[in-house]
Amino acid sequence: MGTADERRFEVLRAIVADFVATHEPIGSKSLVERHNLGVSSATIRNDMAVLEAEGYIAQPHTSSGRVPTEKGYREFVDRLDDVKPLSMVERRAIQGFLESGVDLDDVLRRAVRLLAQLTRQVAVVQYPTLSTSKVRHLEVIALTPARLLMVVITDSGRVDQRIVELGDVIDDHQLSQLRELLGQALEGKKLAAASVAVADLAGQLSGAGGLGDAVGRSATVLLESLVEHTEERLLMGGTANLTRNAADFGGSLRSILEALEEQVVVLRLLAAQQEAGKVTVRIGHETEAEQIVGTSMVSTAYGSNDTVYGGMGVLGPTRMDYPGTIASVAAVALYIGEVLGAR
């Protein structure tokens, strides 16, 4: 790329940085004063004219300054040479804060609150998707000789507890057999495979009396846990940050809030995240969602040991601190995966 093109990109980068910081249209005079671009104000005006003609910046109303367009933000993001990671102190603080979570729900609540504070945007975290989860452990506890508590724990930290009402009482030996049979059928399998295995086990022992009946009743309850409750869940934090940036959205703030409440659009965008460590930036119309027009979404996947648990990210105006947001999203995702993977 030629020298003139490189210089124009430096002008574009300066316009993006100043507009994000000030929310005021940027003129050539302020660029000369704030940035060491090494050229005259007249040259910068010419460069801005070219950038405007090519669609990277625009003139709002009658202002003498210019603001970045979606195309301009995309060029800026695509040419980020290196996103500066958070400092060691910041990363240790994030890790310690997340490690203090007592369970999956607490870890994710902490993550979404932390990400909203770091970026000053709306933070969203998808609960671990059931399609990728495996059964880590099944515990069977006798509450009474005819009532059992089933506890299913997945590798992503989900814990589901179910009560099984037995037709007949079972003794300690039968309880031990039941625990072993169900554990062998379920543990280490993805939920879809585990549901098939437990159904097969129930079929094999159908009509076998006491233990067979207990397996059948347990299987019915476990299938509810493994299959029937697969709705996606989303945690959200920092929605008040939208009102702080209300001017950026024009008249679309209401539709954005409605989209966040309905969750469908955000879940679709997060579901596209299939690679932990890879941050995706969607700017404006790249979200392909009319309800959140005027926003950008920075998202990634989180997981552990090559297993993706779910997606997470932030939603905010196109006038966003992209380098800082990318670094924050990447760091929080990394530590969520580490914390959940260690449990």
Curated annotation (Swiss-Prot):
Stretches that traverse the bilayer: none
Entry-linked Pfam families: HrcA
Keywords per UniProt: Repressor, Stress response, Transcription, Transcription regulation
InterPro entries referenced in this protein's UniProt entry, alphabetically: GAF-like_dom_sf, HrcA, HrcA_C, WH-like_DNA-bd_sf, WH_DNA-bd_sf, WHTH_transcript_rep_HrcA_IDD
GO BP, sorted A to Z: negative regulation of DNA-templated transcription
UniProt superkingdom: Bacteria
Single GO molecular function: DNA binding
PANTHER family associated with the record: HEAT-INDUCIBLE TRANSCRIPTION REPRESSOR HRCA
Matching HAMAP family: HrcA
Function: Negative regulator of class I heat shock genes (grpE-dnaK-dnaJ and groELS operons). Prevents heat-shock induction of these operons.
Family to which the UniProt record says this protein belongs: Belongs to the HrcA family.
NCBIfam families xrefs: hrcA
Protein name: Heat-inducible transcription repressor HrcA
Organism: Mycobacterium marinum (strain ATCC BAA-535 / M)
Gene: hrcA
